[in-house]
Amino acid sequence: MELDQIEAFVAIVRRGSFTGAGAALALSQPAVSRRIDLLEHELAAPVFERTRGGVRLTEAGRAFLPYAETLLASMHDGIAAVRALERPDHGAMTLAIVGTLASTTLTARLRSFRAAYPRVELRLRTALSREVSELVRRGDATLGLRYDVDPDPELVCRTVHREKMVPVCAAMHPLARRRALDVSAFRREAWVAFPARRGAGGEPYTLTIEGRLAAAGLGGAEIIPIDSLTAQKRMVEAGFGLGLFPVSSVDEELRAGTLRTLPVRALQATIDVVLIHRRRAYLSGAAQSLMTALSQWDVSDPRRATRRRRTRARSRAGPGRRAPGRA
């Protein structure tokens, strides 16, 4: 069995056709077909079923796919390890993240990383939690940030942050004007969330929202499925529902006054932010540095650090004296 046969097999799966795989590999369609014929001969089983709409995996193909992806990922790791011997601060690295995590805390760390490693090309991909795991598992991403621990033993998971989630509404929503609220005020309200996916592939973010509503006695509440965080926030701002969002993802809207938090403790929640990588993956020095930065999520928040510095300065200045640098 040759490596180019496995490359062709995985390319067809990801591109959905022999033609697409040929374009990705710079091969003619007959050349791709020849490689698959040889692979199927080696396996003594067909890996694809040809249909009018393209191709789909056979049972043998589905069984072979994770091993093929692992083999290719290991090969790419080996190439990266050898290249790093001569050029340790060069190369490319992909970080896959859940879109709701693209907060000022994360972007500050990514800017610092780029400043420290200007010759490393850092690529970002956004996806749902289960998709982040899949990108890391098959080697398309070096590191991933997702919600909740993935039980897959092939992935190393490290909880780096516990994100607070708060209920919010539009500034002009009737609930925003009420000082005292209890759960009964939400009986007829709709909520926006990412589309639910049941079973093992369910999105932890959506499951957390549904679980919190159910625990508060609102299990029958209407959920408006919207697959974009930005669209969710715009819908809530327009009054088309309420949201249960990570605080970091609505920080700007809360400061601008277009969204208001709802002071109902029963509807507050937390969700773990988890950093993942493949258990046997090669991690360059740059990747390890990024892991360290992401693992210190709560340690060096610029806004918290500024507040701490000002507090210490006031303490040193003593009563009746201004801290340096303050007008």
Task: Place the predicted regions along the sequence by residue.
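Hydrophobic hinge/microswitch elements
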Residues: 128-133, 137-141, 146-147, 204-262, ...
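Conserved amphipathic alpha-helical core elements
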Residues: 39-40, 113
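A short LG(V/I)-centered, amphipathic sequence patch enriched
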Residues: 40-59
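Beta-alpha-beta core module
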Residues: 153-159, 163, 178, 230-279, ...
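Flexible hinge/capping segments at coil-to-helix
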Residues: 155-195, 202, 285
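Short helix-boundary/capping micro-motifs
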Residues: 11-31
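Secondary-structure junction motif
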Residues: 189-216, 283-287, 291-292, 297-309
